[in-house]
């Protein structure tokens, strides 16, 4: 595990303990949930995160990628809960200044964090929103006037279990009848190369003036700029230190 992974695991562990300790001491939780259940849930979910980082990160296969997805999803939930509970504690002096308000605010923070987590999951699974802009370019050649360029960013695709979602994105791109398509970074998550099923879906993106791309930071995480053929097999031509 790299330094970043170690620091991330330690940070999430601290947030994890804080969230379960502060949520577990809420009056309503203390009355209705046995301590053993809280401890078991806390340890179990922490192990899911650690297993996702240790055994799922950078590995191929449905099980490994599913494990990492579960771990990273739980990390996001913990982060939201931590920020909201910590804010409630700061506002009330951790219960020493405003003890009654602290319990109310902490309970509200937990509820808000869970609701935001559900909203975030929904937003992450829905199709991207299409925004249309008319761009005026001084000196543009007459034969290029009125052309449609579709720009797509931050798809963060990686595994075959998101193939249906990606296929929906490709259908939306094709429905716009683009003259050119540009993929502007973070096309994949970068933990492992895109598999054949993903390449086949990307290959359905077509445009008369070509499908072009640039690398984002997530491509560099997996060393993919050194393997452009993995993308070019899908008909994507990458620009790196050059223009066209």
Predicted features by range, described:
Residues 1-126:
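Non-catalytic terminal accessory segments
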Residues 131, 136-244:
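Soluble catalytic domains of enzymes that build or remodel membrane lipids, polysaccharides, and related
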